[in-house]
Amino acid sequence: MSEIFNALPGIEVEVGAIAKSLAHMWEATAASGRAAPASNDVRATQANVVLHLGFNTTPADALEQFQTMLRFSQRYPSRVVVLCPLKEEHGATEMRAKIYGECFLGRSKGDTRCVEFVMLSYPIAARQRLEDQVSICLSTDLPLYYWVHRFLTTQRMADYTYLLSRAKRVLIDSATAPADTLAYPWPNPAALRDLVYSRLLPVRQTVGQFLAGYSPEILVDGLKAVTVRHGGELAAEARVTLGWLQRRLAACGATVQDIAFADETDGNGKFEIHFAYGTAGKFFHWAGDLTTRHAMFEADFGSGPATLPAPVSLLAPEWALSEAMFF
């Protein structure tokens, strides 16, 4: 993981001088005429985010998540601590630190939104000291959000209980997380948020709004099967969508044990939802193309066929983050 730490932007500083180095960085930024947070501007930072890069992270992926946090912070100013663990065979015994800061000017005068990054590279042997160092880097009066990214295994999660327990939200991405992630005994399950579910918000909204035009009784009467078809790259999105449909249909009064729920891999590049009924001619079908961002509804619930074109997309990564954190 030293290659990840080395690939991330920033200025390397002494671990024991992070706060002083951040202050000097902003002083130099302001002196050069660039945007910097005012010392009394409480709006300049609004959240603590710990981005924990697991051993499945590549340097390119780490940079992508760094850029996601930069875009996120243009709307939600943040202090971000990026954790870069080192494998035991690396041989390092000490932590290393980098800092990075950037401010964005808002629409009104005095609306400055800033992000501060502290990157910490640490060997597993130094993990016991990590808690104190992370605590020093965070703003004590702001909420903490813990983003667990591409861990190789959940076995190490117990080593970070202090973050899991303190965080207002714990963020995972079940598309890239270990297979047993959702079954892990999280200290605070209510805080867990899946970024797959979050980025599906536009799909959930458009499908939900269409189906809301019919009574729950009509939707569930005679329902025999619910199928989600998808390309292989959308397997996680299909699984999460199927679970969402099952919960919503149960809320409509369906006996879900009597309905066949399935997801099928399809090579046509579309993301599709199909309801099959025991009544001849009754059906619901939605097909979305995430490349062209076009979708089509087709349905007949007994009152005649209906078709409706609609837009479709997944949330951008920074918007999925905000959805998972705050909603």
Residue ranges and their predicted role:
Residues A62, T93, L130, Q155-A158, ...:
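A short acidic (Asp/Glu
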Residues E116-S215:
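Conserved, well-structured core segments that form the ligand-binding/active-site neighborhood
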Residues A177, L182-K270:
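A contiguous, surface-oriented mixed alpha/beta subdomain in the mid-to-C-terminal portion of proteins
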Residues T68-R71, V134-I136, T161-L164, L242-Q246:
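Short, solvent-exposed amphipathic alpha-helical segments in soluble enzyme
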Residues M1-Y146:
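An N-terminal, globular interaction/scaffold subdomain
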Residues R79-E88, W147-R150, S174-T176, C252-D266:
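A generic structural motif
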Residues T57-A60, L234-A236, G278-A287:
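Short, surface-exposed beta-strand/loop "edge" segments at domain boundaries and coil↔beta transitions
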Residues M1-I11, S21, M25-N40, T45-A47, ...:
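C-terminal structured domains
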